[in-house]
């Protein structure tokens, strides 16, 4: 079973250093400093490096040298997503630009007044996507694991302020299910990842990059139960200061067979996820063995 534990990397001191650089010198100097941090993880974070290296080498077929280079790039891109999150959420002056392919699809979901489910994965920068979704003019709910260490979470909240979306935290008591149900019943948008699960969660299986992999059942159960429109959304970084947000055409799964709906949704999601992984291979932040059964 995949061994992801829902915890993120980093230390409070590291965040403080980068926030200080951002406030005093700007984004590009912070990116420069990030090179050394990325190299540290590249050299000394064996477990996550092995999983990511195997993804480049075994799944995408890259040579050893290219896989190592892509591994370093992956750490550097991941660090940039954390920096960009702080910049955008805290209002630090920046020169970020954005393209938004499929915005009309999300506006159509809002217009339908049926609620909607936006599914993504740990590819690109979901925080940037959440920032852009504000302009849809409707309530946005983001479902997430509470994976930050408490000290880091408190510090980041102090720097950025509270998120401009409603956060629904996944909890062991399943109270998040009721919060999601209420949001959809109120015709709101619910955003969640559909590529990771914790031990004990129910799963569905699909071929992904040539090998069978497991995906969390929860997001697909919700869509099958509430029969709300679905769009697959990703925010990808295309240059140092430019993001490209993709939102697929809305899907409405009306089949009365719940299992058939979940399988069709999963296949649609996997197609979108594979497309983004192949187009932006360095931006899949998957630091565990995704295919381990």
Region spans (language model):
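Membrane-anchoring hydrophobic helices of lipid-metabolizing enzymes
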Residues: 1-120, 164
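Proline-centered loop/turn at the N-terminus of a beta-strand
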Residues: 12, 115, 139, 166, ...
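Soluble or luminal CAZymes and related metallo-dependent hydrolases
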Residues: 13, 48, 98, 172, ...
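Residue-level "edge-of-site" marker
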Residues: 35, 69-70, 146, 173, ...
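Catalytic core of membrane glycerolipid acyltransferases/transacylases, capturing the structured
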Residues: 65-66, 112-172, 197-202
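Short, flexible loop segments at the rims of nucleotide/cofactor-binding pockets, characterized by
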Residues: 92-98, 166-171, 209-210, 255
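Conserved beta-strand termini and adjacent loop/short-helix elements that scaffold enzyme active sites
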Residues: 101, 143-145, 170, 248-250, ...
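Non-catalytic C-terminal accessory region of glycerolipid acyltransferases
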Residues: 135, 162, 174-293
